[in-house]
């Protein structure tokens, strides 16, 4: 394990965790959200090690049909506060979304959509192949 991402844990409440993680060379990664103030962005980018995680939508993770037009603008705004990579995730599931986010973010995080692809292919003899082709379509969107 290289890092910890703990939702809903702000840096000011994570002092002991950050110290313990640091002793084992484990990075702590904090979130910035569409609702984050500049003060919160400043605190979270300063406290993050490894990268900053931008939550590309409000609400819970999963898939969404379209990204808010402000996502790229917000990622660029966060980059004014840090030299660390800014990666974005939550609700990303299509090659077009990966392409759009990838135009600004240093990394694109896809989680729930891959879990969904595994679930949808759970009875298939080619589960690994089907999921691999899906993931490859996302990766290809970045090239």
Model-derived features: where do they sit?
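Glycine-enriched alpha-helix->loop->beta-strand junction motifs that scaffold or abut catalytic
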Residues: 1-3, 20-29, 47-54, 104-107
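Active-site-adjacent beta->alpha loops and helix N-cap segments on the catalytic face
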Residues: 5-23, 37-42, 61-76, 95-98, ...
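Catalytic cores of alpha/beta
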Residues: 36-46, 88, 92-108
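C-terminal helical cap(s) of enzyme catalytic domains, especially alpha/beta-barrels
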Residues: 115-143
